[in-house]
A protein has these predicted regions:
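Conserved glycine-rich cofactor-binding loop
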Residues: 15-17
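A glycine/serine/threonine-rich, flexible loop-to-helix segment
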Residues: 44-52, 101-109, 206-233, 273-287
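Catalytic loop of short-chain dehydrogenase/reductase
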Residues: 93-94, 106-126, 150-151, 159-183, ...
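Short C-terminal tail/terminal secondary-structure segment
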Residues: 94, 249, 260-287
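Conserved glycine-rich Rossmann-like NAD(P)H-binding loop of the short-chain dehydrogenase/reductase
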Residues: 29-45
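A conserved structural motif in NAD(P)-dependent oxidoreductases
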Residues: 233-244
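Short, small/polar-rich loop/turn modules that mediate ligand/substrate recognition or access, typified
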Residues: 196-200, 259-261
Length: 287
């Protein structure tokens, strides 16, 4: 028996990285998992790892910058599976910038924000996109899924994936992203107060997590294993996507039935703000 047997879960941002790690741990705990991403994929990545995962999973395409696409996706999942028990708002992310005013063309391209040759317009589009994807889109998803959860038997669980960049200490090089994640932390508490007792809302604030993007855009080129980068992290390493996934399993399970409106830091005891100088060096080297 798994902790999440017979549960239907949506996980956003499952084309790679943390989203895939979360999806796999929910599958391991017995849930049926519907992943989604902007990229069109035939299946949730890695579901050939276990014999029954492919049967208990699906991958959908969804432009999370379009509330109509979110509405259509949630409606399709509810119609296909009959209910939605879990939402993990994982999609998001950004790329560090040398400063808030200077958004190089390469950074904009990597992030996937709308393009512009005008310096000011490019900066505005970059920061607007970061706030949209890391705060507004998770709110849209939560509202739509909550409506479904309230119209079915039982209770639901929503988990927002935030970041240490949202800590009040500030996050230079990640200004709009950090502001959006701080907003997501506050949103979590507010929604928990509004939507209880039928729907619980919690948040995981991630520290450094070892994904391909983290290796490419955060770890300094002269420190590929992170030995120096992680010197100020008490556990001396990055987290793994599977560790984030196991925290999600706990928050979605009956073991967390009385946990609501909280933000749990998954960061190895990292002190706020200590890693941003290294991140700035990395993006400066990249440019």
């Amino acid at each position: 028996m798994g902790a999440l047997d017979d549960k239907i879960a949506i996980v956003t941002g499952t084309s790679r990285g943390v989203g895939v790690g979360i999806a796999h741990e929910l599958l391991r705990a017995g849930a049926t998992v519907i992943g989604c991403s902007r990229s069109r994929l035939d299946a949730l990545p890695g579901t050939d790892a276990e014999p029954d995962w492919a049967q208990r999973s699906a991958q959908m395409t969804c432009d999370q910058g379009d509330y109509r696409a979110i509405d259509a996706m949630v409606a399709e999942v509810a119609a296909t599976y009959g209910r939605i028990d879990i939402l993990v708002n994982n999609a998001g992310g950004t790329v560090p910038t040398p400063n808030v005013e200077d958004v190089p063309v390469l950074v904009q391209k990597i992030q996937g924000a709308p393009r512009s040759d005008d310096d000011y317009e490019r900066t505005v589009l970059f920061h607007s996109f970061a706030i949209q994807m890391n705060l507004i889109s998770p709110l849209w998803f939560a509202i739509r899924v909550c409506r479904q959860m309230r119209n079915q038997d039982g209770t639901g669980s929503i988990i927002n994936i935030s970041s240490g960049a949202g800590h009040p200490a500030g996050s230079p090089t990640l200004v709009s992203y950090g502001a959006a994640k701080a907003g997501l932390n506050h949103l979590t508490r507010s929604l928990a107060e509004e939507w209880g007792p039928r729907v619980r809302v919690n948040c995981l604030a991630l520290g450094p997590t070892m994904t391909d993007n983290f290796r490419s855009f955060v770890l300094p080129k002269d420190d590929p294993d992170g030995a120096q980068y992680f010197r100020d992290v008490p556990l001396k390493r990055a987290g793994e996507p599977a560790e984030v996934g196991r925290a999600c399993v706990f928050l979605c399970s009956g073991a967390a039935d009385f946990i609501n409106g909280t933000t749990i830091e998954i960061d190895g005891g990292m002190l706020p703000g200590v890693l941003y100088e290294a991140g700035l060096k990395t993006i400066t080297d990249l440019l």
